[in-house]
């Protein structure tokens, strides 16, 4: 109701725990964001921030509002400083659901990123995109495969200092094209393939060997086009003699082009 004592009681007993702002002069989230020493003192005990401002902060000239990004947030986990791949403010803005799960506490947010976010290849800094890093460096893919944490830690420990690019690569470089000793490069382009069939990533992930395996073992039977250079439907329709040889065995058309067709000058796809 309207009773001022009851409203004040509600604010103190419940509203502060929900970090409600009850004055234009004081925003508890801003106060928490600006002062790292207060975060260490009060953590998730929101009442502490209000009480500190009332007792000491205002008189000392501390800012009660105006801070929209956390200052001095924690970046060290397990003895390793993740500052080159982790920005608290960037992270919670990109993944607001993290705050819903663990709250604003900067140590808890960092813990979540390291323990769960990295495995989901979440980007926590404008400076580092794990997908880009994986795409650009084939040697790192061989070393870390689907262990996403490896890419972050490599950049933290060696990559940044070594001048490696943390962002900017939108297509995989140096991807695998050999399966069972046959090089499918003339009918297979990793980047073309995942762009055309994004559901493949949902099934096998970004690993270039796994994507190639999927293409050869399942995609060819579905006559999927994995390169601008080769359209299996066009190749089949343009070469009646091959239809007699391979019929509905779609892999035959791909393999024919790889082994003989391209070298013989046969056209693999309709010219654009």
What does each model-found stretch correspond to?
Residues 1-272:
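Charge-rich, low-complexity intrinsically disordered regions
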């Amino acid at each position: 109701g309207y009773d001022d004592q009851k409203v004040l009681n509600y604010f103190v007993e419940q509203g502060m725990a929900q970090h409600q702002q009850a004055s234009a002069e004081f925003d508890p989230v801003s106060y928490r964001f600006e002062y790292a020493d207060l975060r260490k003192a009060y953590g998730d005990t929101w009442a502490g921030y209000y009480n500190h401002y009332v007792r000491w902060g205002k008189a000392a000239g501390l800012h009660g509002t105006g801070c929209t990004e956390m200052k001095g947030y924690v970046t060290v986990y397990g003895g390793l400083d993740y500052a080159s791949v982790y920005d608290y403010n960037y992270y919670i803005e990109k993944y607001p659901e993290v705050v819903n799960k663990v709250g604003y506490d900067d140590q808890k947010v960092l813990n979540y990123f390291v323990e769960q976010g990295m495995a989901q290849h979440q980007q926590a800094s404008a400076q580092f995109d794990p997908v880009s890093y994986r795409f650009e460096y084939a040697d790192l893919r061989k070393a870390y495969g689907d262990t996403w944490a490896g890419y972050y830690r490599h950049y933290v420990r060696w990559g940044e200092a070594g001048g490696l690019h943390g962002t900017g690569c939108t297509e995989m470089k140096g991807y695998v094209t050999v399966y069972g000793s046959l090089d499918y490069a003339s009918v297979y382009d990793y980047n073309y393939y995942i762009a055309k069939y994004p559901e493949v990533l949902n099934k096998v992930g970004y690993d270039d060997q796994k994507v190639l395996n999927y293409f050869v073992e399942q995609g060819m039977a579905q006559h999927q086009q994995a390169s601008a250079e080769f359209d299996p439907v066009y190749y089949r329709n343009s070469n009646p003699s091959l239809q007699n040889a391979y019929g509905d065995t779609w892999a035959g058309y791909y393999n024919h082009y790889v082994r003989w067709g391209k070298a013989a000058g046969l056209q693999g796809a309709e010219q654009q």
